């Protein structure tokens, strides 16, 4: 997963900011395992060839599909990095 982020990457996870590969990976590894059920996905290119994405859906914790949490995520994919594109900015909000 490290190749999806660079030291320029930022993640806002429910209002808390994490900057750089190390901090972002540590946060993601500390969260409970979930299944993401994507309900909507929109994307468009930006003026500098980044990709702006918006996703909404359900998070299912511990296999409890009857009690999903709703999430919204907006992120920018930037050309570069070892994977070709990387998460430049990512905002995740869980409702």
Residue map of PLM features:
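A solvent-exposed, acidic/Ser-Thr-rich amphipathic alpha-helical stretch
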Residues: 2-49
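A short linear-motif detector with a strong N-terminal bias
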Residues: 16-19, 31-34, 53-56, 65-66, ...
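Generic alpha-helical propensity signal that fires on short helical segments
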Residues: 29, 42, 59, 73-75, ...
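Eukaryotic basic, amphipathic alpha-helical target segments in cytosolic regions
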Residues: 9, 13, 32, 61-63, ...
